[in-house]
Amino acid sequence: MIFARLTALAAFAGIVSVANSADPAPTHVPPSLFKLSDPDLEISVWAASPMLKNPTNMDTDQHGRIWVAEGVNYRSQSKHQPAGDRIVVLEDTDGDGKADKSWTFVQEPFLLAPMGICVIDNKVIVSMTPDLIVYTDVNRNAKFDPGVDKREVILSGFNGRIHDHSLHSVTVGPDGQWYWNAGNSGAQFTDKSGKTFRIGSAYDPYYGRTNPGDLGWNPREIAGSKSDDGFVWIGGFAARMNPDGSGVRILGHNFRNSYEQTVTSFGDVFQNDNDDPPACRVAFLPEGGNAGFCSADGKRSWQVDRRPGQSVATAQWRQEDPGTMPSGDVYGGGSPTGIAFAEESALGEKHRNLLLSCEPGRNTVFGYYPKPDGAGFKLERFDFLTTNPEGKFVGSDFIGGATTVTRELHTLFRPSDVMVGADGAIYVADWFDPRVGGHATMDETLGGTIYRIAPKGFKPTVPKVDLSTPEGAVAALRSTAVNVRGAAFSAVKEHGSKAQPALEKLLKDEQPHIRARAIWLLSHLPRAKARLLELMADKDDNIRLTTLRVIRQLEDRTGSGLTKPFQGDMRGAGTNDGPWYAWQSVKVWTDPSAAVRREAALGLRDVVWQTMGDGRNFYTQDAQQAFIVLAQRFDGKDRAYLDALGLAVRGREAKGYDLLKPSLGNADPLKWSPRWAWIAWRLHPPQSVADFKTRALAPSLPDAERKRALAAITFNHSREAAEAMLEIAAATDKLVKVEAIWWLLNRKDNDWAGHGLANALKTRGIYDPDKIQLTAVVVPEPPKVSQPFSLPDLAKLKGDTKRGALIATACYTCHRVGKEGVEFGPDLTGWASRQPLDVVLRSIVEPSADIAHGFAGHELTLKDGTVIHGLLLADADPVIIMSTGGITQTVPKNRIKEKKPLGRSLMLSAEQMGMGPQELADIAAFLRTK
């Protein structure tokens, strides 16, 4: 929950004090406490409170002014500012590198912690759930006047008002389209083309409660619904559309809560995403990609489907499930927020193509230089900017939340957004807060800061922008600010053919990303296809990739070859009017670049394949042949490429399988090549079940391949698949037997419901709910009058690590520490070394004071009086609960009388374990070495 984090990001600065309580509380982290990755750069304060308050998001306009969305009114504090939240404008009028002027553009009661701001010339787009609002500053005075200016809601229907898992900011892509995303609170909206999108998930944003401003439905109620584009989209999602709100196209889905996206000049989309367990990520988003947070129908959480032995990162992003995209850089706990891509900036050549991602949970802005890696990207992370280089994090949910809050100034840097300014400098917005998480606002000062990162001695200069002339509009395409380029795109498009000479000059630039910006506009000018054909022969991979994307969008607009069949045969000599996949001169499916071939595969998703009524196939054969050739070029390793092949035939996997098997498969499934085994797993149609059963039962195959065969069967919903799994469960081979039984229990009431599995499991002796023996497991309540441990006194004791190692063996029954222990409670490896000593001690003395997210216990009371305490692994029928020591029990639902939250920790307190002060000091000393 990012804004939950951001507003408890807004933990009150009032608790942050200097040694002398009479001194005023600090209002920002001084630049001297920051560490930059490049010693040639410097950081300075560009603006600070009271010029702005609680910044959630920011943007820059063509004049170099910075516009900020404020989040003062949030959840419990939604009436803090009765007039509503503000969009604030800040300006450096004298060019000294510091803002000296600020004013309110708009303030209204409807604005309650808006999550996005985008400025495109005189249009100001504000993301305020349930609406996407466009304010048009008609008189261009940067002050909204209802009598003169315009306010329009162009999209509405996003759930989660005053909740950060909802609508986020708009950014303009290199194609002039508006890109935006929303978290997994759900959405039902109709675009200006009349298409309705219904996007639900397994997430309940209000935990069964109602909330003011809700739309009258819960995302669980619409999970699995088909949208008018013919696809099922779930969870958090990203989209693009025309500036008027028409032509919405979903770019990816099944996120948890991606805060923002950034789009390169080539059209590559990067995003970050989070969850409270340690599996936050930064990733490349392929068109149509499924991130995997929920099940494919959006009805089950990843926790329910987590397989035995899977790590959190693997299970959360379903990296062992067919149909999910590569998860990218999964870096652990955190709460990622704003993201930006700097193709060029004032930072210089060595920082070209710099991807920046804010991580307030770690007091850091991450940096990456994405490198093509097959059909995807390699993302090597580093701390571009941090106040916590030692990684001793506090105040974040992933390391204990409120119990870990300290007053150390360097821990209060909480970046909420990052961007490249119109002057080329990097700007970072900061909440300045000791806490991240908790759906709470605690900041009494409502503080906020904007920092500037630039070369030492940098003198800001904002290039003058003149969109009124073709030459001026084309020149503005070189701007370092993404939405200034967006305004330039619209202006160039409006100038039409008059801009062609200036665009042709831009096409000759030595930098590929500059050339790419011109290519996107070619499709709006005369002779577009002929010019694009020439560019498809360019030696630069990114230019060919961009050109193919432009061609796809061109045909999507004109309707030929993608969304409907093209009537006629245009493959004759000299004509290039047919659909792109039939152009003989555009051999995209044999392109040497895996990224170009990936894009070609993604484009096939929308091609009509079926034969029409009069027997003509309208390029069906061309599309099918392209798919075969693309599959033949899969190297058997590249997961990004593999997923693109699956997306190419989404909804027609069986047809794709039959097309490929003659040339890539083998009649004997034990002789399959790695390439075909992976493709078959990704497509897993009904006709593959028998072959995968053979592979699952073959001890000659590696264990990983046998388990993959089981997964391929499981993700097939047919009766044949369920019966095959029953046969595997009856096998004597323990490896597949145990996993097959797990799959049967997991699927019997969802994907395989209706196949009679309950009776089959009973008659075959695999699972009979009437014969299940259950054991009571009760965690005793701590004593009402606790032993008076004094944390300050405990912290003074010298601990003995050797004695602590012996005492810690008791921890291994519930916790993982290094290579020892059970994965029941939170993994303690490295945890204590990152925490202040008093935090470590308190977690042992008072474990219920702050329970780690994801480890809240439940109490099951059975009809026979048996009580079981533990963590719910599956809340279906049967209920699966894991108790102390990792004991896992399968509980038939009809035997449960009551199920309720435990309300306290599943861990015994130090007093209950009979630990004295010295033993506490010893075990804390030991844990801090691990």
Label each region the model flagged:
Residues 1-2:
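N-terminal secretory signal peptides that target proteins for export/translocation
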Residues 432, 741-744, 865-867, 872-904:
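C-terminal structured "cap/appendage" subdomains that terminate the fold
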Residues 446, 453-807, 824, 831, ...:
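Long, ordered, helix-rich scaffold segments
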Residues 425, 449, 521, 805-819, ...:
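C-type cytochrome heme c attachment motif
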